[in-house]
């Protein structure tokens, strides 16, 4: 309750929808982030390896660091993401860059809660058809997720599958998913536009795209405080807890290099999604973008 109370005091939420469509959804993307690794410029073919090194380094302490950096608020942000997804029994859902399982576990818990209320605890055929796919390019992150799943009693292949894969070249069939989520992952891909295109491809008509990402603060005074916290405190905590200052320095820099809320919403729209909107949380520290494939 204290955490939710704190979130209520801190959260400055707003929802915005892009009302005017782009000139053409087939227009080539004008912004490429292929050569940025934080504030550094790197060869396009090197970025994936560099990002992989970051997450291999922080995998074992990833969830603990999320708690420390966000003062636990990331849990509420992910709850909000799942609330907007509104998962249902029998759905096929893809969670990309979700290696440690945080989003997938929440989706399954929500589905089980809905099912049990409706069926009074009876497992139905449609529940058995529910499948959540966790896709992550980093095997170390997936191993953390698999261990957590085992501790929660989830058997691999029964409602929950772990796939090592690239957000820019997914192995799933066209129109095979009811939902797609990506939390704190899309800013790390080499080509954001390719990841969005793949998300659009694998979704069914009527499928929902949702992205939870650290974004750009839109409250001037809070922005100054947040900048000091980001560049001074987060890397220091990373060094103290994870023994890795540089990875968390990259984290902070990658947030600043990521497109702002309006630009990213435009990119989602250009990928073909409709009814694109976003919701700022905690004054824009994070934003949840959503869109539908119609």
From Swiss-Prot:
Binding residues annotated for S-adenosyl-L-methionine, in chain numbering: 100, 136, 166-167
GO biological process, one term: methylation
GO molecular function annotations of the record: 2-methoxy-6-polyprenyl-1,4-benzoquinol methyltransferase activity
Transit peptide range per the UniProt entry: 1-10
Record key words, sorted: Membrane, Methyltransferase, Mitochondrion, Mitochondrion inner membrane, S-adenosyl-L-methionine, Transferase, Transit peptide, Ubiquinone biosynthesis
PANTHER family registered for this protein in UniProt: 2-METHOXY-6-POLYPRENYL-1,4-BENZOQUINOL METHYLASE, MITOCHONDRIAL, METHYLTRANSFERASE
InterPro entries: SAM-dependent_MTases_sf, UbiE/COQ5_MeTrFase, UbiE/COQ5_MeTrFase_CS
Compartment(s) of residence: Mitochondrion inner membrane
Underlying gene: COQ5
Catalytic activity: a 2-methoxy-6-(all-trans-polyprenyl)benzene-1,4-diol + S-adenosyl-L-methionine = a 5-methoxy-2-methyl-3-(all-trans-polyprenyl)benzene-1,4-diol + S-adenosyl-L-homocysteine + H(+)
Protein source organism: Oryza sativa subsp. japonica
EC number, as in UniProt: 2.1.1.201
Pfam families: Ubie_methyltran
Keyword Transmembrane attributed: no
Quaternary structure annotation from Swiss-Prot or TrEMBL: Component of a multi-subunit COQ enzyme complex.
Annotated protein name in UniProt: 2-methoxy-6-polyprenyl-1,4-benzoquinol methylase, mitochondrial
Keyword Transmembrane helix: no
Gene Ontology cellular-component annotations: extrinsic component of mitochondrial inner membrane
Function according to Swiss-Prot or TrEMBL: Methyltransferase required for the conversion of 2-polyprenyl-6-methoxy-1,4-benzoquinol (DDMQH2) to 2-polyprenyl-3-methyl-6-methoxy-1,4-benzoquinol (DMQH2).
């Amino acid at each position: 309750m204290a955490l939710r109370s704190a979130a209520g005091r801190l959260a400055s939420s707003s929802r915005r929808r892009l009302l005017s469509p782009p000139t053409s959804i087939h227009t080539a993307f004008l912004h490429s982030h292929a050569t940025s690794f934080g504030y550094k410029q790197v060869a396009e073919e090197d970025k994936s390896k560099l990002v992989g090194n970051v997450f291999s380094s922080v995998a074992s302490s990833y969830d603990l660091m999320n708690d420390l950096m966000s003062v636990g608020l990331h849990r509420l942000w992910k709850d909000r993401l799942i609330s907007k997804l509104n998962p249902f029994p029998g759905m096929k859902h893809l969670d990309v860059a979700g290696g440690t399982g945080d989003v997938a576990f929440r989706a399954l818990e929500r589905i089980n809660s809905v099912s049990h209320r409706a069926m009074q605890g009876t497992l139905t055929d449609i529940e058995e058809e529910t499948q959540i796919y966790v896709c992550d390019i980093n095997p170390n992150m997936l191993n953390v997720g698999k261990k957590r799943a085992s501790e929660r009693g989830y058997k691999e292949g029964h409602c929950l599958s772990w796939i090592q894969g690239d957000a820019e070249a997914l192995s799933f069939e066209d129109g095979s998913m009811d939902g797609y989520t990506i939390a704190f992952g899309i800013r790390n891909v080499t080509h954001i536009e390719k990841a969005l295109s793949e998300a659009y491809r694998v979704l069914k008509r009527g499928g929902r795209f949702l992205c939870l990402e650290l974004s750009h603060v839109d409250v001037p005074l809070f922005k100054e405080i947040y900048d000091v916290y980001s560049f001074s405190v987060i890397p220091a905590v990373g060094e103290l807890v994870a023994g890795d200052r540089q990875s968390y320095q990259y984290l902070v820099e990658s947030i600043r290099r990521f497109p702002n809320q309006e630009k990213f919403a435009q990119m989602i729209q250009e990928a073909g999604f409709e009814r694109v909107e976003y919701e700022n949380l905690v004054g824009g520290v994070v934003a949840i973008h959503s869109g539908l494939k119609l």
